[in-house]
A protein has these predicted regions:
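Acidic two-metal-ion nuclease catalytic site recognized across multiple nuclease folds
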Residues: 1-6, 167-206
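Active-site catalytic microenvironments for nucleophilic, acid-base chemistry
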Residues: 108-111, 131, 167-174
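Acidic, divalent-metal-coordinating active-site segment for phosphoryl/phosphodiester hydrolysis
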Residues: 156-170
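Conserved non-catalytic scaffold segment of RNase H-like nuclease domains
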Residues: 1-121, 133-155
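Beta-strand segments within the central parallel beta-sheet cores of soluble alpha/beta enzyme folds
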Residues: 121-123, 183
Length: 206
């Protein structure tokens, strides 16, 4: 099912850890992109990034990355070409990725005077869970626990990215008919519910 939907694309699960939640004031401290390229070759990009500002204790207490951990690490401007190459034209999968991770990374590019990469399609597992009317809570940890996905290292970018990929695979099993169409239609349906064939293909349960 997923293979047919994503065949021919570079598919990457994406997650960030940051100094806070403000795209204007805060900065990235960890970025992970994990998945495979168009030929099925594995991709695992997981980097600690020097944010150039102090990391608040409250943030460090969540993701476990402290000021000492980022000393001597590359800043975002040093990795932006690599990140752009990975994200641009890829199918990006992530939890709350449309409202947090992608806007956050866009601001980092603008801050560096560069245009951000443009994914081919984005699958947000938070929106997907809501579209499928999965019971609350909808945070990544709770959804993974409910679907039998191990998230031992929650709030590390690599673990969260991998978990969102596995969660997507599990969620597709709940309404398989929803994913028997082009990925552009799937993306549209997840975000807007705007695919005309919803009622006939998925039934009234959605």
């Amino acid at each position: 099912m997923i293979g047919d939907l994503l065949d021919g694309y570079r598919v990457l699960a994406f997650d960030l850890e940051t100094t806070g939640i403000s795209t204007r004031r805060d900065r990235i401290v960890q970025i992970a992109l994990v998945g495979a390229d168009e030929n099925g070759e594995q991709i695992h990009y997981d980097e600690i990034v020097n944010p150039g500002i102090p990391i608040p204790f409250e943030a460090s207490n969540v993701h476990g990355i402290f000021d000492a951990d980022v000393r001597g690490k590359e800043k975002f401007k040093d990795i932006l070409s690599t990140v752009h190459e990975l994200i641009d034209g890829a199918v990006i999968i992530g939890h709350n990725v449309l409202k947090f991770d992608l806007p956050f990374i866009e601001q980092e590019y603008f801050r560096c005077g560069e245009l951000p990469p443009k994914p081919a399609f984005v699958i947000d597992t938070l929106l997907l869970a809501r579209r499928l009317k999965v019971g609350r809570p909808h945070n990544l940890g709770s959804l993974c626990s409910r679907h039998g996905i191990d998230l031992t290292n929650a709030h590390t970018a690599g673990a969260d990215a991998a978990a969102s990929m596995l969660l997507f695979a599990q969620l597709t099993k709940q309404q398989p008919k929803a994913f028997r169409r082009p990925i552009a239609d799937v993306e549209q349906w997840i975000i807007h519910g705007g695919v005309k064939s919803d009622a006939s293909e998925l039934g009234r349960g959605l």
